[in-house]
Curated annotation (Swiss-Prot):
This is Alanine--tRNA ligase, chloroplastic/mitochondrial. The keyword Signal does not apply. Its cofactor is Zn(2+). Belongs to the class-II aminoacyl-tRNA synthetase family. InterPro entries: aa-tRNA-synth_II/BPL/LPL, Ala-tRNA-lgiase_IIc, Ala-tRNA-ligase_IIc_anticod-bd, Ala-tRNA-synth_IIc_core, Ala-tRNA-synth_IIc_N, Ala-tRNA_ligase, Ala_tRNA_ligase_euk/bac, Ala_tRNA_synth_plant. SUPFAM superfamilies: Class II aaRS and biotin synthetases (SSF55681), Putative anticodon-binding domain of alanyl-tRNA synthetase (AlaRS) (SSF101353), ThrRS/AlaRS common domain (SSF55186), Translation proteins (SSF50447). Monomer. Keywords: Aminoacyl-tRNA synthetase, ATP-binding, Chloroplast, Ligase, Metal-binding, Mitochondrion, Nucleotide-binding, Plastid, Protein biosynthesis, RNA-binding, Transit peptide, tRNA-binding, Zinc. The lineage of its organism: Eukaryota, Viridiplantae, Streptophyta, Embryophyta, Tracheophyta. Its EC number is 6.1.1.7. It comes from the Eukaryota. Zn(2+) binds at H677, H681, C779, H783.
């Protein structure tokens, strides 16, 4: 049930889709049923799944996949194929060709629109909620309404929501229904209708609109929900034997220890009605599929566990689009619906295989590719760029799984003969072509999506190649370690996981290569590492919980704050509440930090990247008009939607609830924020003009003295591009253009070309800020009235902050003037020091740098010569160990280059075999180490790279290199003498063991 998946702290991993995982043992399935509190695990034993089951693999169902029309054809393959035909051909009066995924989605939305529901667009996969990692349920965008934190905008709504879940990623492709990306169709009521309408409409939709045979539908209800049972049986007409009463774990949804809760009811489709009711416990995953979920929010759970009826009863439902498509299109799994299968077909053609004749392993890999490509396309479209942290890592991991899976099944290069190309863009093209109904914006971001996928794939292919090199080194170490201790060579589970997770090496390939070299693989250790990662991934999803009880009662009772700051910087207001250390008080005295709630305010509360205003609140005497209290406000935040929280310190007197105060915003700081906010809009327009319209905002900060703008782009900007961007912004500033602001319908604003921030939450009415002919954005921030007020714009820095994300920092307004004046002062000082004019500074600096480079080269050359002279004397001190000449010495303050020259000289001078290990501490708190081994020593199996790396650890560092030559460093020069002594002992022992 999706509400439970989103809200229950004990069941946040619960999926609205029954989860199937297969155990290693044959003929044994563990079915995880969707639960509200915890998972119920059933063990289905005995015989294998019957041939002909829609959920089976292999040769159970033989189908022609030549076209979408043919994909519904079933061919008898066993005695039970009559059941297969019964389970598929009886679905509805319409042919499978009528029920495309788009048609199902449209029918669902239109059905509820005809019943008074407002069709709302899918929200972003990046939720407007810091407690939620990714959008995992359709009700997420309505969460504040369900919790009473925001007023309802419409009485009831219907959506098709994009969702991402990766906590069971290893099951994708291996079961019939696990997916990372899916669509959740839903209808929602915010106190408008309740149980009877939800149930009867759900039945009408499934049986009349979609034409599902009523005799194939089973119902689950909460064991104590007699009302729902009665509606299903007495009003809808479902026989009692097909209505199952289940317990609290299965059919009762809670939002946490306290808060909104209620029973739920689920509709299941029966693939094998001829089996009767003997085993019909709805837990048979091969027989039943749950596809529609109705949650009845009717109670409030109190601290003592008791339930009280809610004043406003709500409805939250979810229907898995892919599941309904599977039923109506008569295919054996979600992947073979028209929502995913075109991507699979494309991947199969690139791998030069036929899905129809492919074995189970090949089909599994193709399903993984089909599923993951949908996920990455929608995530990147919603502004999630591949990186090593947070949501970016989810995208990167999915992309890498597709790349390594594609390579595993034989896709090379671009899949069309170009070995240097990338194949993900071709697959993404198919996914994008399927996106127009659910998210039309994906098509407009095609260029950006394809470019990001190509760059990420080519980078990862290089990583894979490095992984091959690492695997060779790890196998060498395993063989060497086994040789030293007499054990059997083994590749540790941690190393296998490193190759799998970081370098994308499939475990089976690692095991195969290791086996060829006689090395076993620690699969138990690998499984433990995988389980640890799974738990971490699960934890990321389990942060989805409500803040019910975290807000004090005073905040909940305060009405929204009226914002006056667009038109005025001062106002008279009434104190509606006071908080000190989170506790509600009536009076606060001098010296206390306080949070103040007003009925109205000119102070801007932090949002949209713009910081909250600073200023003062004043309390005056009623008779003498003298100041009785002064409160300095240093921050303003929003709480529970649109309640402004003024945070500050009582500088004088006291403030009391119910009293009138005068509020005054710091005008100079507000002007700085206005200049930087408008400059941010101009900067975004300039970026789109100079480097391409596909770039998009990834974040921003609008402060009083600076701005920071993060944007999605794959490379650093050149100096020329930065100059053009800066020049264009200043051109717009000097044009003295008047800004226009207006409030309009969201869709009208988008149609007019207004830019919306990815993932930002907007109401039906939005504020649009326009610089005519330059910029139009949805924005609730404060802005200058004319671009001339910005005064000037200067880019301070441009840098990368994550893979595919760049950041520009800049100044405008008074901060721009201060910055330019400071830079001018720096230039004056520089000219004075160099004794040149400003225009000659660059040339003079280049001359000085060239002279410095020449001097450094000369010094380095002299140091190397001195080091070689020292080395010449060391050659005479070499010891002989079993015919091998050995030199281990501390060369004092010789630098790394000199140390290298000395080692090369010694190993060339001494007769082969020879081993030279030198160390030095140049006096800068660092240690340099070098090892040079002649061919004779290398043939003994003694490698310089591994040897010097181990010694360097004693000096607080590390390093490595080739078998014959390696360098290392450290930061503990005091440990150098001891490290060299250990090096001497180990090289002597190694040579002696090889010679004996």
């Amino acid at each position: 049930m999706e509400a439970a998946a989103l809200l229950s702290p004990t069941a946040t991993s619960r999926s609205p889709l029954p989860l199937l995982s297969t155990a290693p043992a044959a003929h044994r399935l563990h079915v995880l049923l969707p639960l509200s509190g915890r998972r119920r695990r059933l063990c289905l034993r005995s015989s294998p799944r019957p041939r002909g089951s829609l959920g089976c693999a292999g040769d159970c169902v033989v189908r022609s996949m030549g076209s979408s029309r043919e994909r519904g054809v079933l061919v008898k393959t066993s005695s039970s194929s009559a059941s297969v035909e019964s389970a598929t051909q009886e679905v509805g009066a319409a042919s499978s060709g009528e029920w495309s995924g788009d048609a199902i989605r449209r029918r669902f939305l239109d059905f509820y629109a005809a019943r008074g529901h407002k069709i709302l667009p899918s929200s972003s996969l990046v939720p407007d909620d810091p407690t939620v990692f990714l959008t995992i349920a359709g009700m997420l965008q309505f969460k504040p309404i369900f919790l009473g934190k925001e007023p309802r905008r419409v009485p009831c709504a219907t959506t098709s929501q994009k969702c991402i879940r990766t906590n069971d990623i290893e099951n994708v492709g291996r079961t019939s229904r696990h997916q990372t990306f899916f669509e959740m169709l839903g209808n929602f009521s915010f106190g408008d209708y309740f149980k009877k309408e939800a149930i009867t409409w759900a039945w009408e939709l499934t049986t009349k609109e979609f034409g599902l045979p009523p005799e194939r539908l089973w119902i689950s209800v909460f064991q104590d929900d007699d009302e729902a049972f009665s509606i299903w049986h007495n009003e809808v007409g479902v026989p009692k034997e097909r209505i199952k009463r289940l317990g609290e774990d299965d059919n009762f949804w809670t939002s946490g220890a306290t808060g909104p809760c209620g029973p739920c009811s689920e509709i299941y489709y029966d693939f094998y009605p001829e089996r009767g009711s003997s085993d019909a416990d709805l837990g048979d995953d091969s027989r039943f599929i749950e596809f529609y979920n109705l949650v009845f929010m009717q109670y409030n759970k109190k601290d003592d566990g008791s339930l009280e009826p809610l004043k406003q009863k709500n409805i939250d439902t979810g229907m898995g689009l892919e599941r309904m498509a599977r039923i109506l299109q008569k295919v054996p799994n979600n992947y073979e619906t028209d929502l995913i299968f075109p991507i699979i077909e494309k991947a199969a053609s690139m791998a030069l295989v036929s899905y129809t004749t492919a074995d189970d392993a090949m089909k599994t890999n193709l399903k993984i590719i089909g599923d993951h490509m949908r996920a990455v396309v929608y995530l990147i479209s919603d502004g999630v760029i591949p990186s090593n942290i947070g949501r970016g890592y989810v995208v990167r991991r999915l992309i890498r799984r597709v790349v390594r899976t594609g390579r595993l099944i034989g896709i090379r290069g671009d899949g069309h003969g170009n070995s240097e190309g990338a194949f993900l863009p071709s697959l993404a093209e198919v996914a994008i072509s399927l996106s127009t109904e659910i998210d039309p914006d994906v098509e407009s971001r095609r260029k950006s999506i394809l470019g990001e996928l190509q760059r990420e794939e080519l980078r990862f292919v290089q990583t894979l190649e490095r992984g091959e090199k690492l695997l060779d080194e790890l196998l060498d170490e395993a063989l060497s370690s086994a040789g030293n201790n007499g054990g059997k060579p083994c590749l540790s589970g941690k190393d296998v996981f490193l190759l799998y997770d970081t370098y994308g090496f499939p475990v089976e390939i690692t095991a195969e290569i290791a086996g060829e070299r006689g090395v076993i693989v620690d699969m138990k250790g690998f499984d433990m590492e995988m389980e640890n990662q799974r738990k971490q991934s699960q934890a990321a999803h389990n942060v989805v919980k409500l803040s019910v009880g975290n807000e004090t009662e005073i905040v909940k009772s305060i009405p929204d704050t009226e914002f006056l700051g667009y038109d005025s910087l001062s106002a008279t207001a009434v104190v509606k509440g006071l908080l000190v250390n989170g506790n509600s008080v009536n009076v606060v005295s001098e010296g206390s930090d306080v949070e103040i709630f007003l009925d109205r305010t000119p102070f801007y509360a932090e949002s949209g990247g713009q910081v909250g205003d600073n200023g003062f609140l004043y309390v005056y005497g009623e008779e003498d008009a003298k100041q009785k209290a002064v409160i300095e406000i240093n921050d303003v935040q929003k709480s529970l939607g649109n309640i402004f929280v003024h945070k500050g310190t009582i500088k004088q007197g006291s403030v009391e609830v119910g009293k009138e105060i005068d509020a005054a915003v710091d005008a100079k700081l507000r002007q700085g924020a206005k200049a930087h906010h408008t400059a941010t809009h101009l900067l975004q327009s300039a970026l789109k003009s100079i480097i391409g319209s596909e770039t998009s905002q990834a974040g921003s900060l609008v402060a009083f003295d600076r701005l920071r703008f993060d944007f999605n782009f794959h490379r650093p900007l050149s100096e020329e591009e930065l100059m053009k961007i800066e020049s264009l912004v200043n051109q717009w500033v000097s044009s003295a253009t008047h800004l226009e602001t207006k409030v309009m319908d969201l869709q009208d604003a988008k149609n007019a070309g207004a830019i919306a921030m990815f993932g930002e939450k907007y109401g039906e009415q939005v504020r649009v800020v326009e610089v005519p002919g330059v910029s139009m954005e949805l924005c609730g921030g404060t802005h200058v009235s004319n671009t001339a007020e910005i005064r000037g714009f200067k880019i301070i820095s441009e840098q990368g902050i994550a893979s595919g994300v760049r950041r520009i920092e800049a100044v405008a307004g008074d901060a721009f003037v201060e910055y330019v004046c400071a830079r001018d002062n720096y230039m004056r000082c520089l000219c004075s020091s160099l004794k040149v004019k400003a225009e000659d500074v660059n040339g003079r600096v280049e001359t000085i740098l060239e002279e410095l480079r020449t001097t450094r080269n000369e010094v380095s050359s002299l140091r190397s010569k001195i080091a070689v002279l020292k080395a010449a004397s060391l050659a005479n001190k070499a010891t002989t160990i079993d015919n091998t000449r050995v030199v281990v010495e501390n060369m004092g303050d010789v630098d790394a280059d000199g140390l290298k020259s000395a080692a090369e000289y010694l190993v060339d001078t001494l007769e082969d075999p020879a081993a030279v290990i030198l160390g030095s501490s140049p006096g800068d708190g660092k240690v340099s180490l070098v090892a040079a081994f002649s061919p004779g020593v290398v043939k003994m199996g003694i490698q310089a790279g591994k040897f010097v790396g181990g010694i360097a650890k004693l000096c607080g560092g590390g390093g490595g290199g080739k078998p014959n030559f390696a360098q290392a460093g450290g930061r503990k020069p005091e440990n150098l003498p001891g490290a060299l002594e250990k090096a001497r002992d180990e090289i002597v022992a190694a040579i002696s063991s090889k010679s004996s």
